[in-house]
Amino acid sequence: MSNLRFACVALLLGGSLAVAAAQNAPSPPQPPAPPQQHIKIAFVQIDGDPRYEPVRGYTRTILKTPEHPYTGAEIGIDEAAPLTRLLNTDFTLDRISVKSPAEVAPAVLAAADAGTQFFLIDAPAEAYQALVTALHGRDVLLFNVSAPDDTLRRDLCSVEMIHVYPSRAQLMDGLVQYLVSRKWSNLLVFEGPTPEDSAMAAAFSHSAQKFGAHIVADQHFKPGTDPRDREQNEPALLSAINRDFDVVVVADSEFDFVRSVPYHLVRPRPVVGSIDLEPVAWHWTWERNGAPQVNSRFEKKAGGHHMEGPDWAAWIAVKMIVQSALRTHSADFAMQRAFILGDNDFDGDKGLAVSVRPWDHQVRQAVLLAAPYEVVGSAPIEGFLHQTNDLDTLGDDQPEARCHLNK
């Protein structure tokens, strides 16, 4: 019996010693943590860009205070913060300011040489030819967040560019779809003297022809109060034509003459284009698809300033970059680029998902039809159908496009 007891005690002691030895044994080496990855995004703007000068009335009263859309990019970065640990990736945003359009290309080239591969470009059209020439063949993506010019999509045709901001063709197609859907098909156009006015009027004319609307007259106005120019600067006289019309469409990039058009026509007609009902990429009164949350975050960050089209474009550009890293589980530029340019959708909080057209790198997106304090509609309007994607009823569809990057 004593021998049995001794054996049991020995067994217990042996087990305890084995456990203690196991506890005191050094842990096996852990694999090293993967290095933190970094995705750098640069926002490039021009100080003194005339597009962001305060818009003043005749007595120098400030009517509009447009701002660079940097805050839109910032809220995109803020939204990415929870993903930093999950992806083991830092997203950083640098702001690059230059003094003229000619300085954009050298600044972007220098940043690319320093390792930045994603650029949000807030510049007018004249900056882009030198930019795409300097960056051609580089591992970069240049996101146009504020220039609507159709020539950038049709003639520049760069594989490095993504046009996040809607083209004039998209905006005017959205407006005309709405007018035609309301059976307002006879249109009187007031066209201003600037190149921007001419471009807007030309885009509108193309859209009217595309969707079966009829321009009854194109009246050229001359801003000012000179009584000798009354026939060109008074809406009542400009609208006194011998044909009826349903709507007056005004192309006035300087927001000067257009303010006198509503309620000063010879017939009581709606006014659209540069005032009252405008086709826009975004509007602060949009209340669907998560828009109130986006607007709230933006206004808090911007000190109460309302979110506008370029702000939305900067925000969704950052979101596309972040989502490409999340959904590919990679910070590799080639993989991200392929995902962004592939047949993939992104939620732009405008209802229909946004994506990049392969033929001209224009982002497909809804166009909001906005009155001053309400979004009255969203294009594509119901009934305007496309064989593959109804968003391709807005802007240059592949068969009519001059740019074919996918060939």
Feature map (PLM): residue ranges:
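Extracytosolic ligand-binding ectodomains
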Residues: 2-9, 21-407
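C-terminal segment of classical bacterial N-terminal signal peptides
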Residues: 14-21
